[in-house]
Every structure is written in C-alpha cells, then in structure tokens.
Amino acid sequence: LRNDLQYAPFRMEGMEQDVREMMEIDTPQGKLALQIGGTIDRLDSKGDTLRIVDYKTGGTPKTPENIEQLFTPADNRPNYIFQTFLYAAILCRKQSLKVAPSLLYIHRAASESYSPVIEMGAPRQPKVPVNNFAFFEDEFRERLHGLLQEIFSQEETFSQTEDTRKCEYCDFRSLCKR
C-alpha cells in the first residue's frame, strides 16, 4: 500500500488482464503465425501513462544495461523484465498512452526507498527509468523476432539446460519431461 500511496492518485484499469497479439516469422516451410502474450497482474493509469504492474514474490530486482542483455543467455539475465517488456510491447500497439512497465517485488515493497520502476543502464552509471516503453519497443521487437526465428529454425539445435533449477518454474517442462 505504501507504494500505491506514493504513486497516487491513479486509476485502476484492470487485474489479471490477458494481452495477446499475433507475430509472423519466416520458416523454410513459409510464414508461421505465432500468438504471443500473457497475463498482466495489474494495469493502472495516471495522466498520460498506462502502468503495467507485475507482482513478484521472490527473486531480486536486476537492472539490465540494455535491451540486448534481455536476449543474451546468462545466469544473471533479468528474465522478469523480459516478460514485462513483452506485455509493454503489445500494449504500445493497442492504445495511445505511454506504457510504463514495472515490477513490484512484494518482499521488498515495505522499504521506504523501494520503487517498482524498471531502470536500465550500465553498472555504476546513471540509470534511465523506463517510463515510456515506446523508446525501447522497436529494438525489443526486432530482437524478439530474431529469437523466435532462431527457435523455429530447423538449422538450430536446442538442448536441455544443464541447470535443472531453471526447470522448477518452467511452463514447458512437461514437453521436455523434466
């Protein structure tokens, strides 16, 4: 509630809001239409901004240096931000307000200094708050399209991760039998 009081006044726009869009990629067999999206925990608006609030009960806030880092496999990759940025990219095309993705880590929200605002920037450098995702949307979509092309490419081989801890919360573990 402290975070909401600090952000107030705002208008609650929705909870558990499904957002989806179709994305086309090229394959050797022709074009493939994919539905991408997910469920946004909460949407609220204030002025000319629509804020995505993604609640997190665990994990640690991470600050990506840039969009590329979201698509680079690494143990410290800020994967929660990827999900929220995907929602933001979809919403940027569905309405005219600025879209501000945010992550609300429940276990950290009681701190006076905590802010759910996502920031980007290099370590020990000034950070840029992501208050208008439109500035990042084109690069995010370009890299997402490239990733999906790679996933559906018959030339690429995909193997299971060696780190089975990553499988604990994976939506696809039933497919790979982990």
Predicted regions and their residues:
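RecB-family 4Fe-4S metal-dependent nuclease core
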Residues: 1-178
